Structures are given as structure tokens and as C-alpha cells.
């Protein structure tokens, strides 16, 4: 009887060990990682760390430690190997803080022309070059997500964010937006 018990333990031990292993991002298929996420984790991944809850107040303050001045981070899920991703604002170039507490150097980003001015050139090659330069800065400063370009059209001249949009013409907006995204994604 003892032999059968020992044999059973050794046969099923690997299954017990592997049953507790969680899929890790980058090592397991993405579908498995998503299946292992709780509904709360999925919601937090989509909403980021701007939400106020007791257990994530620490994560909200981490953005400035990663990239000072960045717009925010996504909620990290360490048990599945999902890191916090840094989001940076940038319809006219990457916007982050120029100063770091830990470094005496100043970190300037390029201030590119606003979207309406870029679109007025009708030059998709130029816009793609601007996008590539933005993408380079995003990469160099350690940001993961650029919250740009803004893909909207000018519907009302009183809209306070029209400077972020390319044009009132949907055709021009589409052509320029494609060029910008291609440029950013070259990195």
C-alpha cells in the first residue's frame, strides 16, 4: 500500500507543481495570460493608475520615478509578468519633465509644429520624418506609449483642442495621420 502511495505521489507531483505556475507575458501565449487575469486586473490594465483605490495609491506615484512628467502608467500585474507601461503626452512632441531629482542634467524634448501646421504642408514624407523623430524620443526617454496623434477632424472652430487635430478635411486628416503613425512606429 505504501508503494502505491509513493508511486502516486511521484506520478502526480509534476502536475501539482505545474498547476500553480501562472503564464508569464512574453513566455506564454497571450491568450493564456489574458485567461489568467482577473476581471479587476483587466479593468485596471485598461484604466491605468489614475484611479484612486487604496491598493494602487503607491503605483500612481511611481510614474514620476520611472519617467518624470509622463502622463501616467498602466497598472502592473507582477504575478503574470506584466510591467507598468509609461504613457507620455505628445501631439506636438514628447512632453516630459526636463529635470530629474537624481541627475543634474536637463532632458529637453523637441517641440514640433502642431498638427494643423503639419497638415497644411500636405507633405506626407515630412510628416513621416516628424513622426520618426517623435518615436525616437519616446524610445530614448523610456516611454512605452505615446498618446498621439489625435485622430479627429475640426468640427467646430471653438474647439479648444483643434491644434491637436490635422484638418477639417477627412481625406487630408487620414493621409497625414497615416504618415505620422508610420513614422512613430518605425522605432
Task: Cite the ranges covered by each PLM segment.
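Sec-dependent N-terminal signal peptides
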Residues: 4-13
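N-terminal beta-rich core of secreted/periplasmic extracellular enzymes
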Residues: 20-187
